[in-house]
Structure formats: structure tokens, C-alpha cells
């Protein structure tokens, strides 16, 4: 049924900019304060006060525009978006309409494979229409007041960058891949903390369907304020099914705004969707046009961090890691910094093993404890020493994992923790050929049946003998030496 239809998705993402004060006032943007304690006369729309643009918000918008290869408008205009809502004190929102500060640009996404649908992973470039500055509204609180609604204006005036894509995504998977890539980028650039639980990064999804081959877009529904990647995927998938079923049953899709109910996993109608003319946009007479000279852009450019794509290429060139590994290592700025700190201590020759550890044991432990890489209890220097001891043959990879877990659990603060634990527990790898031969002779004598099976052509028996040898040495034998000596003795 659904194969007759093509899905069309465009996303509008609100990224809360990481400024200390609001976009048009000096009030704090700190999250979690008591209601209405961070709202000044400008935020409250008291008579006789005027907005003053926050330079830091503009610079963050420029930084984003440079990162996505967009055009930074030399002159842009703030406009009043007129609508009534209890948590919008002025009766209008200051935004940008005809001339946004960021125009165009693109983001390349990696869409993961979908085994159930028989689809391989692929890369896609999503074009952006624009990104514009605007202020956030306050918040209506319905749960804490019986029969009433409370209004908290702490959030009113918080700076937002609204990032709008072209309607180029064709599945929920693509939309989620884009949202994750955008989230990673704004956090990497330091322009947004990306905290989705606090509403710092939230998406509106515009979803429509059309018969395959039809050029004209179908009627779209906008799903508002999706603040998790899972909710984004679920909401889009439900909305696609709803629209297809509605059309195939002879109905028509209505242009409207919908909300997603995560408990019922369905979208429901919120209000009819307005068009731009319904908001009666006009230039805000209280704000001068925003003029951005080339010198300002160059100053922002000089302070830009190395971007993920450039860093991925450098990791591949300098450290010899694969393109996939480089992508994982640059999934966050903190992960990339930790990797480079480990390599700086362990040496470039150990870069590949460092990458394997970060994507394997380190990531596993982070997931186990539910923490991010910037909160890891094992320092880069401590992990580097563990890797050096593997490389110089002091310990086996198995023992290294045991040492790493010990350092993690005891939250050791000494840089030489690995050597201390090796000495205290007697974990040095047995590499003495004579000692290993004696142990292997005992293993062969005690496992005559496995020896016979191996000589009869059963390869699994050889692995069993290796396991017995490692067990006899409590994992301290050099696995490569054990392998070679066993082969030699078994003929």
C-alpha cells in the first residue's frame, strides 16, 4: 500500500543559543530558575522599553552559517510576527522573515542501514533554506493549577536560531539522521548546549505524501515541538500512515498543526495551520537593520573550531583509521579531543588500537554507567599507558581490559595506575618460552582427547587447547606465543 506513495519531509529546528543573556535584553537565560524571576521589563513588554540586540547571538548565527557554507546576509531585518498567546506578552514575536541572517547552506548526513527494509546505509546532502534569529516565547503551565493556567516568562526572549530545510527528506530515517547531524554540529560549534530535555534543541516536522512520480507536493501537516530523536521518528511514521490511510479512504489531508502524544504514539490535531500572511509580518520599527560587514565575518571565522568533516579527513590521513572509525571518533568534540589526547601520550603508532578501544571497551563502559565521554573517570594518560603496555608485551589484551575496568571502578587519579595495578596483582604477561612450553606440555597431557580430535582434523579442538593454556596461566600468557608453541608441538 505505502509503496505507491512518496513521503516529503522538511524540518524546522529551534536551537537555543548559548548566550548568558537574552536576545533583546540583559535578563539571564539560565534554565530552571523560579518562575518569572528572569524576566525584565523588555521581556514583560512594559511600556516605554526598547529591545537591544545581543551581539553574541548574532556571532553564533554567523558561526553556524560559516559551518554549513551558507551566505551571511550583509543586511538583514527583524520583523514582528503577530499572534496572540498568553505566554507572548507583546502580542508579537520578534523574528526575521523576508531577509534572514543565514541563507542557504547544506548538511551531509549518514543514513544507517535498515535490514528489515533491505536498505543499505547511504550518504545524502540536505539543503537548507535559511536560518534566522528570533526570540522564544514564555511557557504555559497547565499541570500545577486546578482549572487555571500559569504563565512563566523566564524563557521569553531567549535567543533562538530557527534552521529550516528544503523539503528534501523522504523518510523518518533521513529526518532523524539530519536532526542528529544538526544537533552534533551546533553542539560542536558551541552555539547551543543541545539539551533536548530542557528544550534547547527541538524540531517541528512538516510532513506530506504524494503519489510516486507526482511533482506537486501534497498537503502538509506540521508536527510541533518534538524534543527527542525517537519521538521525531515515531511522529513522522505515524503521520505518514495517517495521511496515506486518509487519502486511500477517500478523505483529504487538512493543512494543520499537530502535536505528538508519546504515550499513545500518535499525532493529534492542535489547530489549523496558518500561512505567513496570517501573521501580518512587518519590519520592527524598534530595531535597526542588522548590518554584518566582512571584517566581522572574518573575526568569527578566525575563531572557528576545526569542523567534523575536516577532522575526519585528518584522522584518516594522520592516524590511518578508516572513514567509518573517523566518523565515530568525531561524533562529538569531547570524543575527538579524548582520542587525540590518548594518541598524544601513547604515540601515533598506537592510534588504531586507541580507536578500537574508544569504540569498544570505552563506549561500552560509558553506556553501562550512562555517562558521556567528558565525564569518563579514566584519564587519557591512564588509558594511553594501558595501550602502551599491550604494545610492549607487558600485558595481554584480556588483562588490559581487567586493568582498565579496575582504574574505572576505583576512579584512580594517578597517571601510572596501570603499572601500579600490574605490579600489585602480578599481571605481567608470561612471555618466557621455557615457562610457556612447560605449561603447554601439561595442558596437552591433561587434554589428550582434544589432541586426538585436532589430529583427526577438528579445528575447534585447537581453539579449546588455546583456551586451556590461557586458563592455566590465568590469562597472562602471550596469546600469539601460545598459538605458535601449540602448533609446533602438535606437528
Curated annotation (Swiss-Prot):
Q: Name one GO biological process term.
A: translation
Catalytic activity as recorded in UniProt:
L-glutamyl-tRNA(Gln) + L-glutamine + ATP + H2O = L-glutaminyl-tRNA(Gln) + L-glutamate + ADP + phosphate + H(+); L-aspartyl-tRNA(Asn) + L-glutamine + ATP + H2O = L-asparaginyl-tRNA(Asn) + L-glutamate + ADP + phosphate + 2 H(+)
The UniProt entry, under Gene3D superfamilies, shows: 1.10.10.410, GatB domain, N-terminal subdomain
Q: What are the UniProt keywords, alphabetically?
A: ATP-binding, Ligase, Nucleotide-binding, Protein biosynthesis
> Which SUPFAM superfamilies does this one have?
GatB/YqeY motif, Glutamine synthetase/guanido kinase
Highest taxon listed in the record's lineage: Bacteria
Would the keyword Protein biosynthesis be found if you checked this record's keyword annotation?
yes
- EC number(s) reported in the record: 6.3.5.-
Q: Which SMART domains match?
A: GatB_Yqey
Q: Which GO terms describe its molecular function?
A: asparaginyl-tRNA synthase (glutamine-hydrolyzing) activity; ATP binding; glutaminyl-tRNA synthase (glutamine-hydrolyzing) activity
Write down the Pfam families for this protein, in alphabetical order.
GatB_N, GatB_Yqey
UniProt key word Ligase? yes
Extract the InterPro entries matched here.
Asn/Gln-tRNA_amidoTrfase_suB/E, Asn/Gln-tRNA_Trfase_suB/E_cat, Asn/Gln_amidotransferase, Asn/Gln_tRNA_amidoTrase-B-like, GatB, GatB_C_1, GatB_Yqey_C_2, Gln-tRNA_amidoTrfase_suB_CS
Subunit description: Heterotrimer of A, B and C subunits.
Biological function:
Allows the formation of correctly charged Asn-tRNA(Asn) or Gln-tRNA(Gln) through the transamidation of misacylated Asp-tRNA(Asn) or Glu-tRNA(Gln) in organisms which lack either or both of asparaginyl-tRNA or glutaminyl-tRNA synthetases. The reaction takes place in the presence of glutamine and ATP through an activated phospho-Asp-tRNA(Asn) or phospho-Glu-tRNA(Gln).
Q: Which family does it belong to?
A: Belongs to the GatB/GatE family. GatB subfamily.
Output this protein's name: Aspartyl/glutamyl-tRNA(Asn/Gln) amidotransferase subunit B
Tell me which species this is from: Burkholderia lata (strain ATCC 17760 / DSM 23089 / LMG 22485 / NCIMB 9086 / R18194 / 383)
Q: Tell me what gene encodes this.
A: gatB
Amino acid at each position: 500500500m505505502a509503496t505507491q506513495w512518496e513521503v516529503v519531509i522538511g524540518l524546522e529546528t529551534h536551537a537555543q543559543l548559548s548566550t548568558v543573556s537574552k536576545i533583546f535584553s540583559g535578563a539571564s537565560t539560565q534554565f530552571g530558575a523560579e518562575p518569572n524571576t528572569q524576566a525584565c521589563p523588555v521581556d514583560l513588554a512594559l511600556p516605554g522599553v526598547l529591545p537591544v540586540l545581543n551581539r553574541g547571538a548574532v556571532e553564533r548565527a554567523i558561526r553556524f552559517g560559516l559551518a554549513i557554507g551558507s551566505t551571511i546576509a550583509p543586511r538583514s531585518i527583524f520583523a514582528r510576527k503577530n499572534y496572540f498567546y498568553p505566554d507572548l506578552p507583546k502580542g508579537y514575536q520578534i523574528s526575521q522573515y523576508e531577509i534572514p541572517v543565514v541563507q542557504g547552506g547544506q548538511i551531509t548526513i549518514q543514513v544507517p542501514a535498515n535490514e528489515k527494509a533491505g536498505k543499505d546505509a547511504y550518504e545524502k546532502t540536505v539543503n537548507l533554506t535559511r536560518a534566522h534569529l528570533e526570540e522564544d516565547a514564555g511557557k504555559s503551565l497547565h499541570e500545577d493549577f486546578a482549572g487555571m493556567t500559569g504563565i512563566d516568562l523566564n524563557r521569553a526572549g531567549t535567543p533562538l536560531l530557527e534552521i529550516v530545510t528544503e523539503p528534501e527528506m523522504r523518510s523518518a530515517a533521513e529526518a532523524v539522521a539530519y536532526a542528529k547531524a544538526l544537533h552534533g554540529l551546533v553542539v560542536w560549534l558551541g552555539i547551543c548546549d543541545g539539551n533536548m530535555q530542557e528544550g534547547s534543541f527541538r524540531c517541528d516536522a512538516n510532513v506530506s505524501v504524494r503519489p510516486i512520480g507526482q511533482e506537486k507536493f501534497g498537503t502538509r501537516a506540521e508536527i510541533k515541538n518534538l524534543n527527542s530523536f525517537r519521538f521525531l521518528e515515531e511522529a513522522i511514521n505515524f503521520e505518514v500512515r495517517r495521511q496515506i490511510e486518509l487519502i486511500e479512504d477517500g478523505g483529504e489531508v487538512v493543512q494543520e498543526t499537530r502535536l505528538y502524544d508519546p504515550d499513545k504514539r500518535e499525532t493529534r490535531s492542535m489547530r489549523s495551520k496558518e500561512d505567513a500572511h496570517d501573521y501580518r509580518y512587518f519590519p520592527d520599527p524598534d530595531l535597526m537593520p542588522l548590518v554584518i560587514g566582512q571584517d566581522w565575518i572574518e573575526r568569527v571565522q578566525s575563531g572557528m573550531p576545526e569542523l567534523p568533516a575536516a577532522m575526519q579527513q585528518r584522522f584518516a590521513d594522520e592516524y590511518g583509521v578508516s572513514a567509518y572509525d573517523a566518523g565515530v571518533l568525531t561524533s562529538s568534540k569531547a570524543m575527538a579531543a579524548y582520542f587525540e589526547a590518548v594518541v598524544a601520550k601513547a604515540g601515533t603508532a598506537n592510534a588504531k588500537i586507541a580507536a578500537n578501544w574508544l569504540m569498544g571497551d570505552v563506549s561500552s563502559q560509558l553506556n553501562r554507567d550512562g555517562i558521556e565521554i567528558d565525564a569518563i573517570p579514566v584519564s587519557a594518560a591512564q588509558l594511553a599507558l594501558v595501550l602502551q603496555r599491550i604494545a610492549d608485551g607487558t600485558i595481554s589484551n584480556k588483562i588490559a581490559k581487567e586493568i582498565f575496568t579496575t582504574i574505572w571502578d576505583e576512579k584512580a587519579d594517578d597517571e601510572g595506575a596501570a603499572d601500579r595495578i600490574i605490579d600489585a596483582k602480578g599481571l605481567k604477561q608470561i612471555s618466557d618460552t621455557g615457562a610457556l612450553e612447560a605449561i603447554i606440555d601439561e595442558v596437552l597431557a591433561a587434554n589428550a582427547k582434544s589432541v586426538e580430535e585436532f589430529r583427526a582434523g577438528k579445528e575447534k579442538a585447537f581453539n579449546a587447547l588455546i583456551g586451556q593454556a590461557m586458563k592455566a596461566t590465568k590469562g597472562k600468557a602471550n596469546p600469539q606465543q601460545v598459538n605458535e608453541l601449540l602448533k609446533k608441538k602438535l606437528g
